[in-house]
Amino acid sequence: MLEGIEREAAEHSNGCSGPAGHAPPAGAPRHDWTVQQAVALHDLPLFELIDRARAVHRAFHGEHEVQLCTLLSVKTGGCPEDCAYCPQSSHYETEVGPERMLDVGAVLAAAERAREGGSTRFCMGAAWREVKDGPAFERVLDMVRGVKALGLEACCTLGMLTDDQARRLKEAGLDAYNHNLDTSRKAYKSIISTRTYDERLVTLRNVRRAGITVCSGGIIGMGESIADRCEMLVELARLDPHPESVPINALVRSPGTPLESLPPVDPIEFVRMIAVARVMMPRAMVRLSAGRTELSRETQLLCMYAGANSIFYGDRLLTTPNPGQDEDRALIEKAGLQPMAPAAARAAR
């Protein structure tokens, strides 16, 4: 039975049937993946899985390009949500306390530094459960306009959005909105109680209807099973169209959060997750996100070979550490990779 599932997964994964990597993927992306098929794909011998993912990547993306994205927390801490992984939650005693929202000038100065450092996308995050109309949202709209004026792609992650708020963000020039599913529907209940899984999907629908591109992925290493990880990717791959961006995070075990004592993510499992995401969502930008400080340079490069074509660039991701710009620049140069140009980044979305 497993062989049949593997064969079906291979034939419909936008890879051709037959030896992996010897024929280009063809046809429209699938939206009918099953968890069983995704698990079978995940469980292939590692090199076969990577070969299949690489063939898909070659067919849809530049082989040696990586997009550099910068993420800034514009409103830190004091979040009313109880996400078990997050040091910004007001439910836990962590090193991150509530801070005032940044002003527009400070955000645009950070965006200009990001552009000078080579980033082509600038994402602004706020520790909110949902966007509320009022001065804070108006400030975010001004931030988006300013980031666009700098020639950068503008992205936000602000929590739940209504249709009207999504429309206003689009009118301000927003390119992308991040709203992660985090994990599978089953595992989600043990991670978050203050927002439902379906509420997340509604926000993604509102973003899509406004004409903003969707950025949605998840976190591995929160105690979930392999099937849970694959189920999360299936949820994303069943969206039509697929998300334009799929960030894959490894849990950052923040002191004071309920998940601080969990073991680190196995690097090979992280590579597998990247490869499966690439096969299932061939046109998406697959982004190496939080947790890279615990991955070796070699693991990060293997992830890029397996289909990751974007990294978050800068020494912090919201409130968590990230490799420094000099370190990332050296890694990219040593591997012979090229930072993706803005025009190429837009064409690849």
Curated annotation (Swiss-Prot):
Q: Which family does it belong to?
A: Belongs to the radical SAM superfamily. Biotin synthase family.
Q: Which residues bind [4Fe-4S] cluster?
A: 79, 83, 86
Protein name as annotated: Biotin synthase
The segment(s) forming the Radical SAM core domain are 64-283
* Gene3D superfamilies the record matches: Aldolase class I (3.20.20.70)
> Catalyzes what?
(4R,5S)-dethiobiotin + (sulfur carrier)-SH + 2 reduced [2Fe-2S]-[ferredoxin] + 2 S-adenosyl-L-methionine = (sulfur carrier)-H + biotin + 2 5'-deoxyadenosine + 2 L-methionine + 2 oxidized [2Fe-2S]-[ferredoxin]
Q: Please name the pathway.
A: Cofactor biosynthesis; biotin biosynthesis; biotin from 7,8-diaminononanoate: step 2/2
Question: Where is composition skewed (Basic and acidic residues) in this entry?
Answer: 1-11
Q: Which residues are [2Fe-2S] cluster-binding?
A: 123, 155, 215, 287
Quaternary form? Homodimer.
Under the heading InterPro entries, the entry gives: Aldolase_TIM, BATS_dom, Biotin_synth/BioAB, Biotin_synthase, Elp3/MiaA/NifB-like_rSAM, rSAM
Give any GO molecular function from the UniProt entry: iron ion binding
Its BP terms in the Gene Ontology are: biotin biosynthetic process
* UniProt entry keywords in alphabetical sequence: 2Fe-2S, 4Fe-4S, Biotin biosynthesis, Iron, Iron-sulfur, Metal-binding, S-adenosyl-L-methionine, Transferase
Give the Enzyme Commission number.
2.8.1.6
Top-level division of the source organism's lineage? Bacteria
Known role: Catalyzes the conversion of dethiobiotin (DTB) to biotin by the insertion of a sulfur atom into dethiobiotin via a radical-based mechanism.
Tell me which cofactor or cofactors this protein depends on.
[4Fe-4S] cluster; [2Fe-2S] cluster
Gene name for this UniProt entry:
bioB
Q: How is the cofactor bound?
A: Binds 1 [4Fe-4S] cluster. The cluster is coordinated with 3 cysteines and an exchangeable S-adenosyl-L-methionine. Binds 1 [2Fe-2S] cluster. The cluster is coordinated with 3 cysteines and 1 arginine.
| Class in the EC hierarchy, top level | transferase
